[in-house]
């Protein structure tokens, strides 16, 4: 890795940020971390109330990257086969009946799983194999998904009616969980100015599909080449152990409110996001600040809190922040 490659990575990333920023107002951190997750090779979970621009963000990313895009609207009656696809009976040119695989909407480079917590657990689980293995199995036959492949899921807060909490196994498949906050008064004014007039902002495509695919795979390769000093890695390991209630180094807050802490996959997620952040700062090595920026979005959904935490209004973000500030 040389400085020219780092600068090219930063230039491409900032182009995407700026183009998406033309249609998104006040979500700069969310845009950056969502893109960082894509280049880290992971999947993103966006949580927020309806109407905050979660779906628009995912559509804008797909449009800007020039990749194939499919949207799955999760509902209570959605079946697993509606996601992965199914075998259908068809006739060939010799009028012979055969079963043919009809791919579901999961077969795209970028898949928007909209309101994923509106569907039941069985349908939610149909995403698991696709997200982890980059393939789906239908009636005993395995089908590879197109590359690159990213799932960007949106969900409503659990307090809203008609929602099913995502199981821990599925939550762990998401590299980061981002909370989409409501806009401020000035941001809402800007949203109204941009969306209710005659002229609408247009996004430029990063490249055509073939060039974009090649660039993304190259950028992902560069991310893995970022260096991690042993001392920096030790800090990350120490922070993860401090969030485990079974560890001797856990804090009093963790001991009181945490049922299960993050596992190895959580530490991997922090590391991968930190590597992207290092490149965006023009560095070929991770700094402590990269880890401190990445740790909350990468671990907040991997913390399982007890009932006492809910009763006392203690969140995973608060617990992770305490450990982060003490490190």
Regions found by a protein language model. Name each.
Residues 5-9, 23, 172, 177-253, ...:
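Conserved C-terminal "switch" segment of AAA+ ATPases
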Residues 48, 114-115, 126:
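Walker B catalytic acidic pair
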Residues 90-94, 119, 123, 131-225, ...:
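Canonical AAA+ ATPase core
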Residues 7-52:
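Pre-Walker A (pre-P-loop) alpha-helix and adjacent loop at the N terminus of AAA/AAA+ ATPase modules
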Residues 33-36, 90-112:
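Conserved alpha-helical scaffold flanking the Walker A/P-loop in AAA+ ATPase domains
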Residues 2, 245-327:
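C-terminal engagement/docking regions of AAA+ P-loop ATPases
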Residues 35-76:
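Walker A/P-loop
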Residues 49, 83, 154:
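P-loop (Walker A) phosphate-binding loop of NTP-binding proteins
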């Amino acid at each position: 890795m040389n400085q020219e490659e780092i600068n090219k990575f930063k230039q491409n990333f900032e182009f995407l940020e700026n183009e998406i920023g033309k249609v998104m107002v006040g979500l700069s951190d969310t845009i950056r971390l969502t893109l960082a997750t894509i280049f880290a090779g992971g999947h993103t979970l966006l949580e927020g109330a309806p109407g905050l621009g979660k779906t628009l963000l995912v559509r804008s990313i797909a449009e800007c990257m020039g990749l194939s895009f499919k949207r799955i609207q999760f509902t209570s009656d959605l079946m697993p086969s509606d996601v992965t696809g199914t075998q259908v009976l068809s006739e060939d040119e010799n009028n012979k009946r055969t079963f043919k695989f009809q791919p579901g909407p999961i077969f795209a480079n970028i898949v928007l799983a909209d309101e994923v917590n509106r569907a039941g657990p069985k349908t939610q689980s149909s995403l698991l194999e696709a997200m982890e293995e980059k393939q789906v199995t239908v009636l005993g036959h395995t089908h590879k998904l197109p590359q690159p492949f990213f799932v960007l899921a949106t969900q409503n807060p659990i307090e809203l009616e008609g929602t099913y909490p995502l199981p821990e196994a599925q939550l762990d498949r998401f590299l980061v969980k981002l909370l989409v906050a409501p806009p401020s008064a000035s941001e809402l004014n800007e949203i109204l100015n941009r969306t209710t007039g005659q002229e609408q902002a247009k996004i430029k495509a990063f490249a055509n599909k073939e060039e974009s695919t090649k660039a993304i795979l190259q950028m992902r390769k560069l991310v893995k080449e970022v260096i991690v000093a042993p001392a920096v890695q030790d800090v990350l390991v120490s922070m993860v152990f401090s969030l485990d209630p079974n560890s001797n180094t856990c804090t009093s807050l963790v001991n009181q409110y945490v049922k299960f802490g993050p596992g190895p996959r959580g530490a991997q997620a922090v590391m991968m996001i930190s590597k992207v952040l290092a490149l965006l700062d023009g560095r070929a090595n991770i700094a402590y600040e990269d880890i401190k920026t990445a740790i909350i979005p990468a671990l907040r959904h991997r913390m399982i809190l007890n009932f006492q935490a809910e009763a006392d209004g203690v969140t995973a973000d608060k617990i992770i922040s305490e450990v982060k500030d003490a490190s």
